[in-house]
Design a protein with these regions (language model features):
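Signature for phosphate-centric chemistry
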Residues: 1-119, 127-230
């Protein structure tokens, strides 16, 4: 069957892993675990990414160019905007559950480590969504074994390796002569975006789309992404 959730592209929620782990070699057992993760599912990083699509659709509604499906999407965008207001970049409830799931799988898969009294060193960047991701993971482990001792920290001291910013790498990725740079500068997206079908679903006047919505603009792409996210 087709998983429609994958239409969200890199905004799709990570699937819960179901594959069996490779057992340890005979005569060996786990004694230490080092885990490095990204934060869980988050809201869009800028509130304007919710506001701009809504304003575009609101203007289209005022001009009477929304289709019946466009009206439905407009209503959904209103709901999404109200729910997401003030949450730009925050960890979502899904994101919190993802990290609780990671903590639970750690406990289930490595009882030799987490089934006894040990110390857990848990660190994150200073970004709120990362801190809360870490905390949810630790809370899940704590609920499964009250004998675990946690050291939690979120400090600029550790940012150099957790969220490293390499100026030379950024310069290389921004080089227009490199094919790879197209992905990071947005030109690849511009060249591969074909929104005509979606625009016909949302709007009943394609001249309006071309001259007002500008489907290949940042706002137009945001409308498409919000539609996929729903």
């Amino acid at each position: 069957s087709i998983n429609k959730e994958l239409a969200g592209g890199n905004m799709s929620v990570y699937p819960v892993p179901t594959k069996a782990l490779t057992p340890a070699p005979k005569g060996y057992q786990p004694f230490y675990l080092s885990h490095y993760a990204r934060h869980g599912s988050r809201y869009r990083t800028e509130e304007i990414e919710y506001k701009n699509p809504l304003e575009t659709m609101k203007k289209a509604k005022e001009n009477g160019v929304l289709t019946a499906d466009g009206e439905k999407i407009f209503d959904l965008l209103n709901q999404v905007y109200e729910y997401a207001k003030g949450h730009a970049g925050d960890l979502t409830m899904v994101g919190a559950l993802q990290h609780r799931g990671i903590g639970h799988r750690m406990y289930d898969n490595f009882p030799e480590i987490f089934g006894k009294e040990i110390e857990v060193d848990a660190r994150s960047t200073t970004v709120i969504r990362s801190i809360l991701s870490k905390v949810n993971e630790c809370m899940e482990l704590q609920s499964l074994n009250s004998k675990l001792h946690f050291y939690n920290d979120a400090s600029p001291h550790d940012m150099y390796y957790m969220n490293n910013n390499n100026p030379l790498l950024n310069q290389i990725l921004a080089d227009p002569k490199l094919e790879l740079s197209k992905i990071f500068t947005g030109t690849y997206l511009e060249s591969t975006t074909t929104p005509d079908r979606l625009m016909k679903v949302l709007f009943n006047n394609q001249d309006y789309v071309r001259w007002v919505v500008n489907a290949k603009s940042k706002i137009g792409r945001a409308v498409q992404q919000e539609c996929r996210d729903r």
